[in-house]
């Protein structure tokens, strides 16, 4: 069964020479990653992940590098400041094999608190990290750190074979956090954004299936469709 630690206590378990893997965006364990910034003894700490949702001081420290599969604002800022942020080319389908090849000693994620069946739910992120999370929990020479947060919703896949839970008995370290989940702000569109969205809307036929992305223009398109008469 796991030990329950504070973020700082969990951060103390990381070696000066180590590898840490995490998933995209909503998988980021914010309290743990923040606590790592309190140390300055890193010799060769390498992160493997994607799309940070916060700016973490640990990534500004000497001896720390980050292999990133998807750049967001935090990665671009860190890179512009001269820190060791390296892009790992690959599509979403390559996230799982890239992470497996990286083979971090430590895997981390945020999740819901354990349920009555003794499982945590990966909540807002499933992605391609679960197999590596499970491997980290099963091998005694690796470490699985899960940061639980009661503010996270429980989710499940439409397809039953894609489970997004992790049994508590596989977890080495539990961190109890209570921060609010990250939420994207909806910036006000300018005239150009509205014009582009209006052009895109003309290509959406009644009954179409639409995959949207993150950003002002996809938000305008989705909002206009929601308010419109298309089925």
Predicted regions and their residues:
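Conserved alpha/beta enzyme-core scaffold
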Residues: 1-231
């Amino acid at each position: 069964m796991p030990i329950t630690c504070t973020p700082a206590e969990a951060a103390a378990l990381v070696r000066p020479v180590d590898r840490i893997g995490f998933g995209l965006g909503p998988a980021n364990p914010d309290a743990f990653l923040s606590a790592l910034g309190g140390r300055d003894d890193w010799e060769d700490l390498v992160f493997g992940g994607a799309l940070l949702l916060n700016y973490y001081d640990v990534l500004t420290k000497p001896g720390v590098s980050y292999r990133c599969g998807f750049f967001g604002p935090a990665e671009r800022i860190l890179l512009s400041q001269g820190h060791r942020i390296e892009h790992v080319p690959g599509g979403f389908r390559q996230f799982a094999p890239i992470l497996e090849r990286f083979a971090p000693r430590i895997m981390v994620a945020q999740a819901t608190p354990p349920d009555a069946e003794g499982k945590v739910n990966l909540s807002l992120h499933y992605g391609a990290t679960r197999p590596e999370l499970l491997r980290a929990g099963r091998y005694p020479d690796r470490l699985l750190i899960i940061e639980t947060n009661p503010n996270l919703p429980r989710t499940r896949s439409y397809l039953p074979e894609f489970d997004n839970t992790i049994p508590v008995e596989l977890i080495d370290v539990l961190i109890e956090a209570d921060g609010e989940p990250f939420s994207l702000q909806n910036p006000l569109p300018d005239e150009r954004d509205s014009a582009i969205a209006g052009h895109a809307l003309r290509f959406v036929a009644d009954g179409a299936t639409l995959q949207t992305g993150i950003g002002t223009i996809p938000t305008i398109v989705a909002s206009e469709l929601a308010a419109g008469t298309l089925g």
